[in-house]
């Protein structure tokens, strides 16, 4: 996890209105994603999940995708993507998402009530994305085995967990202090 932590410490921070936003390859694709850092993150995720407890990986567009794809390839488990645009397929579920800097809609396809899911995402900030996705998965009736985010910058993670009814496993916890990323663990 050394590579992941070091790369986070060096991540630039910009302001989106009043919201401090860190820029990192695994959360933004900028600069380019170092395969060693991605592998580091995937190895850490594998340590905190039970790989026999789910049959499908779910990743949220956009930056949950590199993590989800790498996990899918490593574990040889199928992956589905929660998209930001509709396809109009039978069974598609739309949820409304609100983050610290935007609002939008997410569209869930290729999940059924028979699925047991591993939900992965790049970062937890406000909890808006995870909350919306979990609500949609609950509507479908699928089971959630684990929820894992690579980077947690939410100081109130327990409130998000209480709201969604699941523990959120995190790989690295950070905070933004004086315009810089501080790794907490």
UniProtKB/Swiss-Prot annotation:
Pathway: Purine metabolism; IMP biosynthesis via salvage pathway; IMP from hypoxanthine: step 1/1. GO terms for cellular component: cytoplasm. Keywords: Cytoplasm, Glycosyltransferase, Purine salvage, Transferase. The lineage of its organism: Archaea, Methanobacteriati, Thermoplasmatota, DHVE2 group, Candidatus Aciduliprofundum. It is found in: Cytoplasm. One of its GO terms (biological process) is purine ribonucleoside salvage. Its main location: cytoplasm. This is Hypoxanthine/guanine phosphoribosyltransferase. It is an enzyme of class 2 (transferase). It catalyses: IMP + diphosphate = hypoxanthine + 5-phospho-alpha-D-ribose 1-diphosphate; GMP + diphosphate = guanine + 5-phospho-alpha-D-ribose 1-diphosphate. It comes from Aciduliprofundum boonei (strain DSM 19572 / T469). Belongs to the purine/pyrimidine phosphoribosyltransferase family. Archaeal HPRT subfamily. Gene3D superfamilies: 3.40.50.2020.
């Amino acid at each position: 996890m050394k590579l992941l932590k070091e790369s986070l410490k060096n991540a630039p921070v910009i302001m989106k209105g009043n919201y401090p936003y860190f820029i990192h390859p695994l959360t933004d694709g900028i600069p380019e994603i170092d395969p060693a850092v991605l592998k580091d993150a995937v190895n850490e995720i594998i340590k905190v999940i039970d790989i026999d407890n789910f049959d499908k990986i779910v990743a949220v567009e956009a930056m949950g995708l590199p993590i989800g794809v790498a996990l899918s390839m490593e574990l040889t488990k199928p992956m589905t993507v929660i998209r930001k645009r509709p396809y109009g397929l039978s069974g598609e579920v739309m949820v409304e998402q609100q983050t610290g800097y935007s609002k939008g809609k997410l569209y869930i396809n290729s999940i059924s009530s028979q699925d047991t899911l591993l939900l992965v995402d790049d970062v937890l900030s406000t909890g808006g994305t995870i909350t919306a996705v979990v609500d949609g998965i609950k509507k479908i009736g699928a089971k959630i085995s684990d929820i894992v985010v690579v980077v947690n910058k939410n100081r109130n993670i327990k409130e998000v967990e209480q709201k969604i009814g699941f523990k959120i496993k995190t790989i690295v916890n950070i905070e933004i202090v004086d315009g810089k990323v501080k790794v907490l663990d």
